[in-house]
Amino acid sequence: MTIQRILGMIAVSLLAVIAYLFFDISHRLEKARSEDPLVWVSDIEAFAERGVGEPESLLFVGSSSIRFWGELARDMTPVPVINRGFGGSKIGDVVYYADTLFQADNPRAIVIFVGTNDMTPQ
């Protein structure tokens, strides 16, 4: 295999990754700008499938600040956590899905961080 062919394959792979990321970001922005809470139904169904979590957990609910808190479990050690962040969500979305989002087995505390997307211009 020649170096040119390898470079060509790398270039095609990079273009595919860039196209995927562009589509993914565009899709997320579209969801975040939507006033329809039903755009989040797949995210909420995934939370419901995971169940109520460990008893006495800290329950975190909110937007991308919660969703992308990669070290949440480590930062809250030794207390177990439940992460129910869905990026781009607004206050109305959390209220709409409250029955599912706030299902937990006797949570120690509930942390809610949502609202910054409500201030985003359309």
Region annotations inferred by a language model:
Residues D43-A48, I91-Y97:
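N-terminal post-signal-peptidase region of extra-cytosolic proteins
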Residues R84-K90:
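Short beta->alpha junction loops
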Residues S34, G88, Q122:
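Charge-dense, low-complexity intrinsically disordered segments
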Residues L59-V61, I82, I110:
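Conserved beta-strand elements of the Class I
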Residues I66-P80, G92-Q122:
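Oxyanion-hole/transition-state-stabilizing segment in secreted/luminal serine hydrolases
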Residues S64-S65, G85:
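Catalytic nucleophile serine of serine hydrolases
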Residues A19, F23, H27, A46, ...:
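Low-complexity, compositionally biased segments
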Residues M1-F60, G70, R74:
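N-terminal secretory targeting modules
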